[in-house]
Swiss-Prot record:
The active site is at residues 9, 87. GO terms for molecular function: phosphoglycerate mutase activity. The record marks 182 as: Transition state stabilizer. The keyword Signal does not apply. Catalyzes the interconversion of 2-phosphoglycerate and 3-phosphoglycerate. PANTHER family: PHOSPHOGLYCERATE MUTASE. It catalyses: (2R)-2-phosphoglycerate = (2R)-3-phosphoglycerate. This is 2,3-bisphosphoglycerate-dependent phosphoglycerate mutase. It holds the Pfam family His_Phos_1. Keywords: Gluconeogenesis, Glycolysis, Isomerase.
Amino acid sequence: MIKLVLLRHGESQWNLDNRFTGWHDIDLTDKGRREASNAGKLLCEAGFEFDVAYVSVLKRAIRTLWNVLDEMNLMWIPVIRNWRLNERHYGALQGLNKAETAQKYGDEQVLVWRRSYDTPPPPLERTDERWPGSDRRYAALDADEVPLTECLKDTVARFLPFWHETIAPEISKGRNVLIVAHGNSLRALVKYLDGISEEDIVGLNIPTGIPLVYELDDNLKPLKSYYLGDQEELKKAVDAVAGQGKA
Protein backbone atom coordinates (compact mmCIF):
# COMPACT_ATOMS: atom_id res chain seq x y z
CA MET A 1 0.00 0.00 0.00
CA ILE A 2 1.21 3.50 -0.87
CA LYS A 3 1.29 6.05 1.93
CA LEU A 4 1.75 9.80 1.50
CA VAL A 5 2.20 12.16 4.45
CA LEU A 6 1.22 15.83 4.37
CA LEU A 7 2.22 18.21 7.15
CA ARG A 8 1.39 21.84 7.68
CA HIS A 9 4.26 23.74 9.32
CA GLY A 10 4.22 24.30 13.06
CA GLU A 11 2.80 27.48 14.58
CA SER A 12 4.52 30.60 13.23
CA GLN A 13 4.82 33.95 14.98
CA TRP A 14 2.16 35.40 12.71
CA ASN A 15 -0.13 32.43 13.36
CA LEU A 16 0.19 33.33 17.03
CA ASP A 17 -0.44 37.01 16.25
CA ASN A 18 -3.44 36.01 14.07
CA ARG A 19 -2.06 37.83 11.03
CA PHE A 20 -2.39 37.00 7.34
CA THR A 21 1.03 35.56 6.52
CA GLY A 22 1.07 34.48 2.88
CA TRP A 23 4.56 34.65 1.37
CA HIS A 24 6.04 36.67 4.25
CA ASP A 25 8.97 34.64 5.57
CA ILE A 26 8.17 34.48 9.28
CA ASP A 27 9.72 31.88 11.59
CA LEU A 28 8.20 29.34 13.99
CA THR A 29 7.34 30.08 17.60
CA ASP A 30 8.73 27.85 20.34
CA LYS A 31 5.37 26.07 20.30
CA GLY A 32 5.71 25.61 16.54
CA ARG A 33 9.10 23.96 16.96
CA ARG A 34 7.64 21.64 19.58
CA GLU A 35 4.77 20.81 17.23
CA ALA A 36 7.24 19.94 14.49
CA SER A 37 9.31 17.74 16.79
CA ASN A 38 6.16 16.03 18.06
CA ALA A 39 5.10 15.36 14.46
CA GLY A 40 8.42 13.60 13.94
CA LYS A 41 7.85 11.51 17.06
CA LEU A 42 4.34 10.55 15.93
CA LEU A 43 5.67 9.49 12.54
CA CYS A 44 8.42 7.42 14.17
CA GLU A 45 5.95 5.74 16.51
CA ALA A 46 3.72 4.90 13.53
CA GLY A 47 6.65 3.27 11.75
CA PHE A 48 7.09 5.75 8.91
CA GLU A 49 10.28 6.05 6.87
CA PHE A 50 10.79 8.55 4.06
CA ASP A 51 12.94 8.49 0.94
CA VAL A 52 12.43 12.11 -0.13
CA ALA A 53 10.80 15.26 1.24
CA TYR A 54 9.25 18.22 -0.54
CA VAL A 55 8.91 21.63 1.08
CA SER A 56 8.21 25.25 0.19
CA VAL A 57 10.92 27.93 0.16
CA LEU A 58 9.56 29.60 3.32
CA LYS A 59 11.46 29.11 6.56
CA ARG A 60 8.49 28.11 8.72
CA ALA A 61 7.99 25.04 6.54
CA ILE A 62 11.72 24.36 6.10
CA ARG A 63 12.38 24.53 9.84
CA THR A 64 9.40 22.28 10.50
CA LEU A 65 10.86 19.74 8.09
CA TRP A 66 14.28 19.99 9.76
CA ASN A 67 12.75 19.23 13.16
CA VAL A 68 10.74 16.31 11.80
CA LEU A 69 13.72 14.76 10.03
CA ASP A 70 15.93 15.32 13.07
CA GLU A 71 13.46 13.44 15.29
CA MET A 72 13.32 10.63 12.73
CA ASN A 73 17.11 10.47 12.20
CA LEU A 74 16.49 11.19 8.51
CA MET A 75 18.40 14.44 8.06
CA TRP A 76 20.31 12.76 5.22
CA ILE A 77 17.41 12.17 2.81
CA PRO A 78 17.00 14.35 -0.30
CA VAL A 79 14.95 17.52 0.22
CA ILE A 80 13.43 19.38 -2.72
CA ARG A 81 12.41 23.00 -2.09
CA ASN A 82 10.00 24.63 -4.51
CA TRP A 83 8.06 27.89 -4.51
CA ARG A 84 4.98 26.13 -5.87
CA LEU A 85 4.43 24.69 -2.39
CA ASN A 86 4.34 28.18 -0.83
CA GLU A 87 1.32 29.43 1.05
CA ARG A 88 -1.19 31.32 -1.08
CA HIS A 89 -0.35 35.01 -1.37
CA TYR A 90 -2.81 37.13 0.60
CA GLY A 91 -2.27 40.29 -1.40
CA ALA A 92 -3.02 43.54 0.42
CA LEU A 93 -4.20 41.59 3.48
CA GLN A 94 -0.70 40.23 4.12
CA GLY A 95 0.50 41.30 7.56
CA LEU A 96 -2.94 42.45 8.76
CA ASN A 97 -4.58 41.03 11.88
CA LYS A 98 -7.43 38.70 10.89
CA ALA A 99 -9.78 39.67 13.71
CA GLU A 100 -9.23 43.41 13.12
CA THR A 101 -9.81 42.88 9.40
CA ALA A 102 -13.06 41.07 10.23
CA GLN A 103 -14.14 44.00 12.41
CA LYS A 104 -13.53 46.34 9.48
CA TYR A 105 -14.99 44.27 6.63
CA GLY A 106 -17.22 41.76 8.45
CA ASP A 107 -16.78 38.08 9.27
CA GLU A 108 -18.48 36.98 6.06
CA GLN A 109 -16.18 38.95 3.75
CA VAL A 110 -13.06 37.75 5.56
CA LEU A 111 -14.30 34.15 5.38
CA VAL A 112 -14.70 34.57 1.62
CA TRP A 113 -11.15 35.93 1.31
CA ARG A 114 -9.72 33.19 3.54
CA ARG A 115 -11.62 30.12 2.44
CA SER A 116 -13.51 30.60 -0.84
CA TYR A 117 -12.20 28.94 -3.97
CA ASP A 118 -12.06 31.74 -6.50
CA THR A 119 -12.27 35.13 -4.73
CA PRO A 120 -8.81 36.65 -4.12
CA PRO A 121 -8.11 39.40 -1.58
CA PRO A 122 -7.32 42.90 -2.91
CA PRO A 123 -4.00 42.81 -4.81
CA LEU A 124 -0.72 44.47 -3.93
CA GLU A 125 0.99 46.96 -6.20
CA ARG A 126 4.36 45.86 -7.55
CA THR A 127 5.86 48.87 -5.78
CA ASP A 128 4.66 47.53 -2.40
CA GLU A 129 7.52 46.20 -0.27
CA ARG A 130 5.39 43.13 0.49
CA TRP A 131 5.49 42.03 -3.16
CA PRO A 132 8.17 39.31 -3.34
CA GLY A 133 9.31 40.04 -6.89
CA SER A 134 12.70 41.37 -5.76
CA ASP A 135 13.39 38.44 -3.42
CA ARG A 136 16.39 36.39 -4.63
CA ARG A 137 14.63 33.09 -4.07
CA TYR A 138 12.19 33.99 -6.87
CA ALA A 139 14.80 35.40 -9.25
CA ALA A 140 14.25 32.63 -11.80
CA LEU A 141 10.54 33.43 -12.12
CA ASP A 142 8.99 35.77 -14.63
CA ALA A 143 7.45 38.83 -13.00
CA ASP A 144 3.97 37.60 -13.96
CA GLU A 145 4.57 34.36 -12.04
CA VAL A 146 5.15 36.22 -8.77
CA PRO A 147 1.65 36.87 -7.43
CA LEU A 148 0.12 40.17 -6.39
CA THR A 149 -2.68 38.19 -4.71
CA GLU A 150 -4.06 34.67 -4.91
CA CYS A 151 -7.24 32.75 -4.30
CA LEU A 152 -7.25 29.00 -3.70
CA LYS A 153 -7.94 28.43 -7.40
CA ASP A 154 -4.64 30.19 -8.19
CA THR A 155 -2.83 28.08 -5.61
CA VAL A 156 -4.24 24.90 -7.15
CA ALA A 157 -3.08 26.08 -10.58
CA ARG A 158 0.55 26.49 -9.46
CA PHE A 159 0.73 23.47 -7.12
CA LEU A 160 -0.81 20.73 -9.29
CA PRO A 161 1.73 20.90 -12.15
CA PHE A 162 4.48 20.26 -9.59
CA TRP A 163 2.45 17.39 -8.14
CA HIS A 164 1.88 15.76 -11.54
CA GLU A 165 5.35 16.37 -12.97
CA THR A 166 7.55 15.83 -9.92
CA ILE A 167 5.95 14.40 -6.79
CA ALA A 168 3.46 11.87 -8.18
CA PRO A 169 6.05 10.11 -10.39
CA GLU A 170 8.28 9.60 -7.34
CA ILE A 171 5.38 8.08 -5.39
CA SER A 172 4.58 5.83 -8.35
CA LYS A 173 8.17 4.54 -8.24
CA GLY A 174 7.53 3.32 -4.72
CA ARG A 175 9.32 6.10 -2.88
CA ASN A 176 7.99 7.17 0.51
CA VAL A 177 7.17 10.89 0.30
CA LEU A 178 6.70 13.60 2.92
CA ILE A 179 5.31 17.01 1.90
CA VAL A 180 5.70 19.90 4.36
CA ALA A 181 3.85 23.00 3.25
CA HIS A 182 1.14 25.45 4.30
CA GLY A 183 -2.55 25.60 5.12
CA ASN A 184 -3.72 26.64 1.68
CA SER A 185 -1.17 24.87 -0.50
CA LEU A 186 -2.15 21.67 1.31
CA ARG A 187 -5.84 22.51 0.96
CA ALA A 188 -5.16 22.76 -2.78
CA LEU A 189 -3.69 19.25 -2.86
CA VAL A 190 -6.36 17.77 -0.58
CA LYS A 191 -9.07 19.29 -2.79
CA TYR A 192 -7.54 17.51 -5.77
CA LEU A 193 -6.91 14.17 -4.05
CA ASP A 194 -10.34 13.95 -2.42
CA GLY A 195 -12.29 15.57 -5.25
CA ILE A 196 -13.74 18.21 -2.93
CA SER A 197 -16.12 20.64 -4.61
CA GLU A 198 -15.47 24.38 -4.86
CA GLU A 199 -18.34 24.92 -2.41
CA ASP A 200 -17.28 22.34 0.18
CA ILE A 201 -13.62 23.35 0.26
CA VAL A 202 -14.67 26.42 2.29
CA GLY A 203 -15.13 24.15 5.31
CA LEU A 204 -11.71 22.47 5.17
CA ASN A 205 -9.24 23.63 7.83
CA ILE A 206 -5.79 22.05 8.24
CA PRO A 207 -4.13 22.35 11.67
CA THR A 208 -0.47 23.15 12.25
CA GLY A 209 2.02 20.41 13.03
CA ILE A 210 -0.23 17.32 12.82
CA PRO A 211 0.65 14.68 10.18
CA LEU A 212 -2.10 13.86 7.67
CA VAL A 213 -1.68 10.38 6.18
CA TYR A 214 -3.11 9.31 2.83
CA GLU A 215 -3.32 5.66 1.85
CA LEU A 216 -3.37 5.51 -1.96
CA ASP A 217 -4.05 2.84 -4.57
CA ASP A 218 -1.71 2.15 -7.49
CA ASN A 219 -3.33 5.01 -9.45
CA LEU A 220 -2.67 7.38 -6.51
CA LYS A 221 -6.37 7.58 -5.70
CA PRO A 222 -7.13 7.86 -1.96
CA LEU A 223 -8.39 4.77 -0.14
CA LYS A 224 -8.49 6.54 3.22
CA SER A 225 -6.92 9.46 5.06
CA TYR A 226 -6.40 10.22 8.72
CA TYR A 227 -4.45 12.41 11.13
CA LEU A 228 -1.96 10.93 13.57
CA GLY A 229 -2.16 11.75 17.26
CA ASP A 230 -4.80 12.48 19.86
CA GLN A 231 -8.19 13.13 18.28
CA GLU A 232 -9.35 15.58 20.95
CA GLU A 233 -6.22 17.67 20.40
CA LEU A 234 -6.85 17.45 16.66
CA LYS A 235 -10.38 18.81 17.03
CA LYS A 236 -9.15 21.70 19.17
CA ALA A 237 -6.48 22.52 16.59
CA VAL A 238 -8.92 22.43 13.66
CA ASP A 239 -11.45 24.58 15.55
CA ALA A 240 -8.71 27.10 16.35
CA VAL A 241 -7.85 27.47 12.66
CA ALA A 242 -11.53 27.85 11.76
CA GLY A 243 -11.96 30.66 14.29
CA GLN A 244 -8.98 32.78 13.24
CA GLY A 245 -10.89 35.03 10.86
CA LYS A 246 -13.67 36.11 13.21
CA ALA A 247 -14.04 39.52 14.81
